[in-house]
């Protein structure tokens, strides 16, 4: 099947150089296989460019009192969903031949990753984008009840899962009853494409 339009979703706009390298490497791999129509969306952040890496000291990061109040009463997953749902729906309405989520350590029990994975997969499939793969993803080891529930529901809806290490494959099988295949971490080719 010829892939005319591919959507990549990962943490490519984070301030982590490894995440940026993963995104660059994945785009390079697709382009080197004659796939030119590539769109990108950040997995968890509603931004249009990579976060600049700060080298100075952080001055004041104090939020106004009203924001602090809402952060305390609204659960983090709901806050994330409110901030990102419009972006996810808009991107999901386009038609893609393939959606690649990954690489990186995206199967984690934290404030945003499980709800991000659930939201992306739910809305992509709702709008007809069912050819979704997780590529070169890593997994954490411990999951909260809600994160386990969200990942179990979501991972079953993904066409193919490629884990970047054997431990992640084992966790996917034992925790979520999901089979996956091994693939090398795509970030390792970054040095070859930058030289």
Regions found by a protein language model. Give the residues of each.
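Aromatic- and Gly/Pro-rich donor/ligand-binding loops
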Residues: 2-143, 153, 187-188, 193
């Amino acid at each position: 099947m010829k892939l005319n339009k591919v959507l990549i979703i990962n943490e490519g706009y984070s301030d982590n150089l490894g995440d940026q390298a993963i995104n660059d490497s994945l785009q390079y791999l697709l382009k080197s296989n004659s796939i030119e129509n590539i769109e990108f969306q950040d997995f968890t952040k509603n931004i249009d460019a990579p976060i600049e890496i700060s080298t100075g000291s952080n001055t004041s990061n104090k939020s106004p009192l009203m924001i602090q109040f809402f952060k305390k009463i609204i659960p983090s997953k709901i806050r994330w969903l409110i901030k990102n749902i419009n972006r996810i729906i808009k991107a999901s309405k386009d038609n893609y031949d393939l959606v690649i989520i990954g690489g990186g350590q995206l199967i984690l029990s934290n404030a945003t990753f499980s709800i991000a994975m659930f939201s992306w997969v739910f809305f992509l499939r709702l709008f007809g984008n069912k050819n979704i793969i997780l590529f070169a993803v890593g997994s954490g080891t411990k999951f909260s009840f809600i994160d386990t529930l969200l990942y179990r529901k979501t991972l079953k809806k993904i066409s193919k899962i490629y884990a970047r290490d054997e431990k992640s494959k084992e966790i996917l099988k034992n925790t979520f009853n999901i089979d996956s295949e091994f693939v090398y971490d795509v970030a390792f080719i970054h040095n070859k494409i930058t030289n």
